[in-house]
Amino acid sequence: MIRSLHTSAVRQGRKKWPKPLPGSVTGNEFVKKLELKAPIAPALDNIEVPDSHPLWQFFCKDKKIVRDQRSFDSSTRPWSVAELRRKSFEDLHALWYVCLKERNILLKEERVTTRMHFENQNGGYRSEHDRVGETMVNIRHVLAERYRAFEEVQQVLPEVRAQANAEFDEKYVTADAVYDSELSLELERHLVAYYGFSTDPRANAGVQVDEKIIEAVKYGAKLKYERYSGATDENGNPIANHGFVHQPKRDIFEQYLMFLANDTTEGVAEALSYIKQYRESNPLPVAPWNAIRVLQHLVEEKMGAAAVFEEALKNKKLDLSEQDILENIPAQFLNKLPKE
């Protein structure tokens, strides 16, 4: 809008504070009474660093900025490859981080002496650093050896596993009933050794299901069915005649139920009874392409249920109903239920 130049135009008023002026303008009483103290000169004594501060990891135990090079033991030597081969993975992991921490301390001390223009006198830090570094190189060498050995075993393992399975099959299926308990332990060792999977859900913590685990479940279920399905129940009827003679194990869910069964006639009969109830509910069979995901879910579910059940037994109280136990607890834990 253009201001009019006409003499009769209304003069625009200017906004002014009323009198007296507000306190925010005249001054604040709190500010007037505030007394400024003399500044505190910076000093090292005024700085407190907690012992848990992570930067202390770059210092030695006595928290000196630089250690005396004469304190280094020149008679020490790096760990040899032969010595490290006898160490476990946990020991190698711990030793690696001890060496890494020591190298960081030595590099810090070397850098400090260089800044102080003593670079011609810090050879001790460099030589000690090289000794620690040689140990770390040897650790990597040992780990590389183990990895190459693992890769080579993976190439021949299927053939070795097939041969071991063939030898164990005949022994397991044809043995007398008096060896049931012994065969149960042998089957457990066989599955863990060649497949890395156990019939005890508690031992499968952290297991990632893959094709090898699927094969282990199928193999264990097949052996138990072949050994005990020809037995008879208390009425003299074959336990295999529980409604599915032609399809004993239809999908991975039924195979896992048989895999968890106790190595006894009663255990297999109980698993067959569960499978019969499952089929009578008319579910859709688990597709082969979905077997890994379904089995992973079953393993985690049974592992959690077994942990709850073991805790209940430990505390001598069971808050689970009978139906919950039958649905969630693996068969090998049912015989642990307290009898009245």
From Swiss-Prot:
Gene3D superfamilies: 6.10.140.1190, 6.10.330.20
A GO biological process held by the record: mitochondrial translation
GO terms assigned for molecular function: structural constituent of ribosome
Region (Disordered): 1-22
Source domain of life: Eukaryota
Sequence similarity: Belongs to the universal ribosomal protein uL29 family.
Keyword Ribonucleoprotein: yes
Gene giving rise to this polypeptide: MRPL4
Keywords: Mitochondrion, Ribonucleoprotein, Ribosomal protein, Transit peptide
One GO cellular component, as annotated: mitochondrial large ribosomal subunit
PANTHER family documented for this protein: LARGE RIBOSOMAL SUBUNIT PROTEIN UL29M (PTHR21183:SF18), RIBOSOMAL PROTEIN L47, MITOCHONDRIAL-RELATED (PTHR21183)
Quaternary structure and interacting proteins, as annotated: Component of the mitochondrial large ribosomal subunit. Mature mitochondrial ribosomes consist of a small (37S) and a large (54S) subunit. The 37S subunit contains at least 33 different proteins and 1 molecule of RNA (15S). The 54S subunit contains at least 45 different proteins and 1 molecule of RNA (21S).
Pfam family, one: MRP-L47
Listed name of the protein: Large ribosomal subunit protein uL29m
Organism listed in the record: Yarrowia lipolytica (strain CLIB 122 / E 150) (Yeast)
Segments of skewed composition (Polar residues): 1-10
Annotated localization: Mitochondrion
